[in-house]
């Protein structure tokens, strides 16, 4: 029986129809790029200090010395969360005493910012941090907002596949596109931090569901030779384009509500794609809607200037296709044998670490020296060559060496940052860009690599579990950035160390480059070291007079 690709081979590989679908589905991902990272500017924390009300009767000298100083990055700056007790310094001011000359400031009693804060408006006019005072004792709320967004992404990744299988790829694509745009718009009317955060969780659910639906729809419509390019370059590069657009919007629109309003406009415009993007013929056939699938295929043929055959799907082939029942497998199968259990655990570690590094560096933009808008643009732009490099490596070089090298590059430069003198801050920023380049390349390659490691019977499940680990990494990443408030090098030390350890771990994965995809668990490639363990086990068994087990051949380390 012919498969779907053989049946539709008459359409060609790269005709006008395929090019249109490739571009439109990739373009639908652009809003995902700036919605996911918009929190960098929506929750930006400007320099701030305790507010000293104008109603307090202070001399100009005491008003200028009302905030204690602290040493930060080798210079004296006003503290952000403390001030001298106003009642005390008001009395000194009334008595005509001068700060520093008549009064030792180090001996003065201090207090919290009881009247709120005043914020520097050179970078941001307004953010959710300045509007709801998410600083000092409430500074944990901003990273929590980001983490909960990724919790929404995690929930969306669970339900998106089921919704897509039940209601169709196209319907779910545009439903979740509307969900992402609609809830982003509703965030404009947030009256408090809690309302904003709940809506942001729903935006996260829509974002990942939209991404998955577009990804699946493209892989099902496009031909075999185009699918890999679509998966590694198409959606990824257009996501990076969306990320690159974000700082351009944010530079010209520095009020968080107006910025959010501007970011919803492209999502609304994407709604017009409904009339150009078809449903997946594969999904229609799986639902028994063969005539609808044929209509789409014939329109594609006409668009490509090709005459479709009179009969596209043979009734007997469809009957054979519908009679095939997939064998049931459970998540337990991912740990059923020693080999697949080790691969699953290693994959979870690999995905989690890469995700922490990718999102941690993306969210760390405000902490970099230099202009935040330029730095954000560069962190987004560096993803484009990273994706191109990943695609080239996947075409020509072994997987585990490629991923390990990319991770080692990313991790090592992050560790070097702490050695850079403070006056060479541009070098530190450049090292962060190189680190983002390496980790992004690994992120792009790990999707293909994981799919090649798992057998057909549990491939979707294996990639799904690994992807879930990635979501957990993204949830943790804001708190890696948060540690920079205590030591600006600590996030880089942690992310760099984890990335290098994972690069070493990757070398123990089996090599799938050039190997046929396994169909069963027994056909899986062996983890490095498993063969030696089996040989030792066989020797012990033979000494005991038992039957020697079969040793599967593995690729040499």
From Swiss-Prot:
ATP binds at residues 218-225. Residues 42-142, 194-197, 254-257, 363-373, 428-430, 484-488 are extracellular. Residues 537-557 are annotated as: Disordered. The modification Phosphoserine is found at residue 548. It is a multi-pass membrane protein. The modification Phosphotyrosine is found at residue 486. One of its GO terms (cellular component) is plasma membrane. GO terms for biological process: (R)-carnitine transmembrane transport; (R)-carnitine transport; adult heart development; carnitine metabolic process; carnitine transmembrane transport; carnitine transport; establishment of localization in cell; liver regeneration. Residues 1-20, 164-172, 219-232, 279-341, 395-406, 452-462, 510-557 are cytoplasmic. GO terms for molecular function: (R)-carnitine transmembrane transporter activity; amino-acid betaine transmembrane transporter activity; ATP binding; carnitine transmembrane transporter activity; PDZ domain binding; quaternary ammonium group transmembrane transporter activity; sodium ion transmembrane transporter activity; symporter activity. InterPro entries: MFS_dom (IPR020846), MFS_sugar_transport-like (IPR005828), MFS_trans_sf (IPR036259), Orgcat_transp/SVOP (IPR004749), S22A4/5 (IPR045915), Sugar_transporter_CS (IPR005829). Its main location: membrane. It is found in: Cell membrane; Apical cell membrane; Basal cell membrane. Belongs to the major facilitator (TC 2.A.1) superfamily. Organic cation transporter (TC 2.A.1.19) family. This is Organic cation/carnitine transporter 2.
């Amino acid at each position: 029986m012919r498969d779907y690709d053989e049946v539709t081979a008459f359409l060609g590989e790269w005709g006008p129809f395929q090019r249109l679908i490739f571009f439109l589905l990739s373009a639908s991902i652009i809003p995902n790029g700036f919605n996911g990272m918009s929190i960098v500017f929506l929750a930006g924390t400007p320099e701030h200090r305790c507010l000293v009300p104008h109603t307090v009767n202070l001399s100009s000298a005491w008003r200028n010395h009302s905030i204690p100083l602290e040493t930060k990055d080798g210079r004296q700056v006003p503290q952000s969360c403390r001030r001298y007790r106003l009642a005390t310094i008001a009395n000194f001011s009334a008595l005509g005493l001068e700060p520093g000359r008549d009064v030792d400031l180090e001996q003065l009693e201090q207090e919290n910012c009881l009247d709120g804060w005043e914020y520097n408006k050179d970078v941001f006019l307004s953010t959710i941090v300045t509007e709801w005072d998410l600083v000092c004792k409430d500074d944990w709320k901003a990273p929590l907002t980001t983490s909960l967004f990724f919790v929404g992404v995690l929930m969306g990744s669970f339900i998106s596949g089921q919704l897509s299988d039940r209601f169709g790829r196209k319907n779910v694509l545009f439903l979740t596109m509307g969900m992402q745009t609609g809830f982003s718009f509703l965030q404009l009317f947030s009256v408090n931090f809690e309302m904003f955060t709940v809506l942001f969780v729903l935006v996260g659910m829509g974002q990942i569901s939209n991404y998955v639906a577009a990804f699946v729809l493209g892989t099902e419509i496009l031909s075999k030779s185009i699918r890999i390019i679509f998966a590694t370059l198409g959606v990824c590069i257009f996501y990076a384009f969306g990320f690159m657009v974000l700082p351009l919007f944010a530079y010209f629109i520095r009020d968080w509500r107006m910025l959010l309003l501007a970011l919803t406009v492209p999502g609304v415009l994407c709604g017009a794609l409904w009339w150009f993007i078809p449903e997946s013929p594969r999904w229609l056939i799986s639902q028994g809607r063969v005539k609808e699938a044929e209509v789409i295929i014939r329109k594609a043929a006409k668009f490509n200037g090709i005459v479709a055959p009179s009969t596209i799907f043979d009734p007997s082939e469809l009957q054979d296709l519908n009679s095939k029942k997939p064998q049931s497998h459970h998540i337990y199968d991912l740990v059923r044998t020693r080999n697949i259990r080790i691969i699953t655990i290693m994959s979870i570690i690999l995905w989690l670490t890469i995700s922490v590094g990718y999102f941690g560096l993306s969210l760390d933009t405000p902490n970099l020296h230099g202009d935040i808008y330029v730095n954000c643009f560069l962190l987004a732009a560096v993803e484009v060559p990273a994706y191109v490099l990943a695609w080239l490596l996947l075409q020509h070089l072994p997987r585990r060496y490629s991923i390990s090298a990319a991770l080692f590059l990313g991790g090592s430069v992050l560790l070097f940052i702490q050695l850079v003198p403070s006056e060479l801050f541009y070098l530190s920023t450049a090292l962060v860009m190189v680190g983002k380049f390496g980790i992004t390349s690994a992120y792009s390659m790990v999707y293909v690599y994981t799919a090649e490691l798992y057998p057909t019977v549990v491939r979707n499940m294996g990639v799904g579990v690994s992807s879930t680990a990635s979501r957990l990494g993204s949830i943790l990443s804001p708190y890696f950035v948060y540690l920079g408030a205590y030591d600006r090098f600590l996030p880089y030390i942690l992310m760099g160390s984890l990335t290098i350890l994972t690069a070493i771990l990757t070398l123990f994965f089996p090599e799938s480059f050039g190997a046929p995809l396994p169909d069963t668990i027994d056909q899986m490639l062996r983890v490095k070291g498993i063969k030696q363990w089996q040989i030792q086990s066989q020797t012990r068994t033979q000494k005991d007079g038992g039957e020697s087990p079969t040793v599967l051949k593995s690729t040499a380390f």
